[in-house]
Amino acid sequence: QGVNIYNISAGTSVDLAAPVTTGDIVTFFSSALNLNAGAGNPNNTTLNLFAENGAYLLHIAFRLQENVIIFNSRQPDGPWLVEQRVSDVANQFAGIDGKAMVTVFDHGDKYQVVINEKTVIQYTKQISGLTLSLSYNATEETSIFSTVVEAVTYTGLA
């Protein structure tokens, strides 16, 4: 219980020392924000929360070329479920110059996703379970975030 800090390089994942469950929080901190990375490539930067079985409990994809943030879930080897979209990516990062903070609050039946202190979505969970690992991925070195993001979990708060 308490606070755990993880450094996640692009293309890698980390196992959590304590699972994230209802009432807990995950925050991803990036020391850089590159909203010009999308020219000519799909620029799909993703942050993911995984269950023990490898299910994507929450998949957050920042797609600059399409100018959307996609939220979705899927079971291992299963299809993606019903995606939810928030448009105007750059506008969602207003407020903190040159840096990014993406916070996920686990409310039990939904995830509240806050970007730079502004709620962008209340995502109704399509798959339930404890978050036991996190990942950070980016297409071809064109992440909108820094090469390493810091993830902080706040657990046992409830």
Curated annotation (Swiss-Prot):
Q: Which GO terms describe its biological process?
A: apoptotic process; positive regulation of apoptotic process
Query: How does the record describe its quaternary structure?
Result: Homodimer.
Provide the GO MF annotations for this entry. Answer: DNA nuclease activity; polysaccharide binding
* This protein's name: Anti-tumor lectin
Quote the EC number: 3.1.21.-
Xref: PROSITE patterns? GALECTIN (PS51304)
Q: Which InterPro entries match?
A: ConA-like_dom_sf, Galectin_CRD
The superkingdom of the source organism is Eukaryota
Q: Where does N-acetyl-alpha-neuraminyl-(2->3)-beta-D-galactosyl-(1->4)-beta-D-glucose bind?
A: 43, 59, 63, 72, 74, 80, 83
Query: Which top EC class is named for this enzyme in its record?
Result: hydrolase
Residues with the modification Blocked amino end (Gln), per the entry, are 1
